[in-house]
Amino acid sequence: MSLNINTKYRDDSNSWVVELSGELDVSCADDLKKELDSNIEKKFSDVKVDMSNLQYIDSTGIGVIVGAMKKLKSGDKDITILEAKDNVKKIFKITGLDQIIRMEG
């Protein structure tokens, strides 16, 4: 399975929403990194990552999320994970990232 990435900017909340579906692993993590980096540089707003349709994430995918978080925090912005499935939430909990990255839903 592959990763699908849809993005949209929300003026009302000054946030950029990234919708992920499929699997985020080593084979496609670079695609997400490029998308995040490009949009962080352009808009530099808060980022909300909708993971409601993400089936799987590996350590490479986690690394991309952490890298984006660091770039955002350096500009006083934030990243929020939305609606992650239980198996994806478990990875964030095991790594302790649920204490660092805001998770909703």
Predicted segments with their positions:
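Short acidic-hydrophobic, aromatic-tinged amphipathic segments that line or gate anion-handling sites
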Residues: 102-105
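Amphipathic alpha-helical interaction surfaces in cytosolic regulatory modules
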Residues: 26-100
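STAS-typified acidic loop motif
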Residues: 7-34
